[in-house]
A protein has these predicted regions:
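Membrane-interface helix-loop junctions and terminal tails of multi-pass membrane proteins
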Residues: 2-311
Length: 311
């Protein structure tokens, strides 16, 4: 009889052990899922958290963009790339350790696409940069007694030639910025020099493209001079003729203007009475600089990634 009882209870104990093991596996799985979800939530909180020095970042970007805009406005056409490049070197040297010295919505966008900047910070950078450019406009307008008045009638105008110039120049510039920032061993002075030099090269490259485009437009005008008529907006020539150069910066383009007919003839600083100064801030500049920044920054990431794989 004792033997029969033992044989009956053995399967029950085995079943109990299996059930206990299953419960343990279930508990472990639940704990693992909870741990993963907790880690993800912490990561989201970290990405959306604003830095403690946000006000310092905003003020630094306002001041930096203000200085860069003034440099772009008062630089001569011949040496503008050098003057603006030196101005950016100075800006990076003084505020680079505070905000990174973007002073350019396109640079901010490019770094964001490279995942070098939190999404929550992008509106603050853009707002500060445009505020700095507007401060420069107000200052110049007050110094000229209202002679520096802007018109935004050309905001929706689109020229593929101007788009190409801005895109190529911005791509070259941000490619250089990404390369400098990747080199952690470079000191602050070296970074300032490298970033300023990248802007110079970007302006020179796009400026050379601009000269070819202008030459082509002038040759076409001379060929069709007998049938040339004034456009509806009062202009005689295509828009490419009125562009003194590229901006590579949507904030700076807010203050930079296209030349008027009188300025083309006399190289004057201010337009003649009754003429409009059209702001370079337009859809073509915005789209070209943002796309160019994303292309330049991510192209460097691709090249640098392939280089690491080969090593």
């Amino acid at each position: 009889m004792a033997t029969k009882k033992t044989s009956k209870k053995a399967p029950v104990k085995a079943a109990e052990k299996k059930t206990a093991a299953a419960k343990t596996e279930t508990k472990t799985t639940v704990k693992r899922v909870v741990a993963e979800s907790t880690a993800k939530s912490k990561r989201v909180e970290l990405d959306s958290k604003l830095p403690n020095n946000l006000i310092n970042i905003v003020i630094a970007e306002v001041i930096g963009t203000f200085i860069l805009t003034l440099a772009a406005l008062f630089a001569s056409d011949i040496l503008s790339s050098m003057y603006v490049g030196f101005a950016l070197m100075f800006i990076v040297a003084i505020i680079g350790n505070i905000s990174g010295a973007h002073v350019n919505p396109a640079v901010t966008f490019g770094l964001w696409t490279m995942r070098k900047l939190k999404t929550v910070l992008v509106p603050f950078y853009w707002g500060a940069q445009f505020l700095g450019a507007m401060a420069a406009i107000v200052l110049v307008g007050s110094l000229t007694n209202g002679g520096f008045a802007l018109s935004f009638d050309q905001f929706t105008a689109f020229s593929w030639n101007i788009f190409a110039m801005e895109l190529v120049g911005t791509a070259v510039f941000v490619f250089g910025v990404a390369a400098v920032l990747q080199r952690k061993e470079i000191k602050a002075a070296g970074q300032a020099f490298g970033i300023g030099l990248a802007l110079m090269i970007g302006l020179v490259v796009s400026g050379s493209i601009s000269s070819y485009i202008k030459s082509t437009a002038i040759a076409k005008i001379q060929k069709d001079q007998s049938t040339t008529q004034t456009e509806k907006n009062g202009r005689t020539y295509p828009r490419e003729i009125y562009i003194s150069g590229v901006t590579l910066n949507p904030a700076v383009s807010l203050a930079v203007t296209e030349k008027t007919d009188s300025q083309l003839r006399s190289n004057g600083v201010l337009p003649a009475e009754g003429e409009k100064s059209y702001s370079r801030f337009s859809l073509e500049v915005i789209a070209a600089t943002l796309i160019g920044a994303a292309l330049g920054g991510n192209l460097f990431l691709l090249v640098n990634y392939r280089n690491k794989d080969e090593e």
